[in-house]
Amino acid sequence: MLTPFCSSHHLQEKMNSCQSNPTKMDNSENVLFNDQNENFTLVAPHPSSSYLTRDQEHEIMVSALRQVISNSGADDASSSNLIITSVPPPDAGPCPLCGVAGCYGCTLQRPHREVKKEKKYKGVRKKPSGKWAAEIWDPRSKSRRWLGTFLTAEMAAQSYNDAAAEYRARRGKTNGEGIKRRWR
């Protein structure tokens, strides 16, 4: 299904004939490529494909980049090389995400991985080793007091709450209201 074109004049004639008679070429599925010698080639993808493969996308991008680099000094009107590309419409029906028939954006996107956020606790931080450290500000000595290293963030938060309960008379804040506090 390759049709070579020797010049831009032949290409323009072929495009005009295809626009006037759509049975000759379904221009929603064909891609035109040019080579170094200004020969244009009409490439039709496999009829069962509903979107471009990575190789087809790569070829289109490389061809477009060559076109831009080779015509960097020339204006678009005087350029004899043409690259016309069109992506075939997806034939799977309406998009399940946006509900639009023939949607290009949703069908080509990769699913995003959801990032699970860890709950933040006051006075608790994660160490590079993966363990959790707890420390609290001691108002008497005006320094941080080390409470220890724990396997889970909840265990470190409980340690912080216990230490904050000691300073409660001095308005110590805790992580959550439902956690049991010690009075001394």
Swiss-Prot record:
Keyword NAD: no
Molecular-function GO terms, alphabetical: DNA binding; DNA-binding transcription factor activity
Any GO CC annotation of this UniProt entry: nucleus
Intracellular or extracellular location(s): Nucleus
Gene3D superfamilies (alphabetical): AP2/ERF domain
Alphabetical list of PROSITE patterns matching this protein: AP2_ERF
Transmembrane region(s): none
GO BP terms, alphabetized: ethylene-activated signaling pathway
Family of this protein: Belongs to the AP2/ERF transcription factor family. ERF subfamily.
Name used for this protein in its record: Ethylene-responsive transcription factor ERF122
Protein species of origin: Arabidopsis thaliana
Gene this chain is encoded by: ERF122
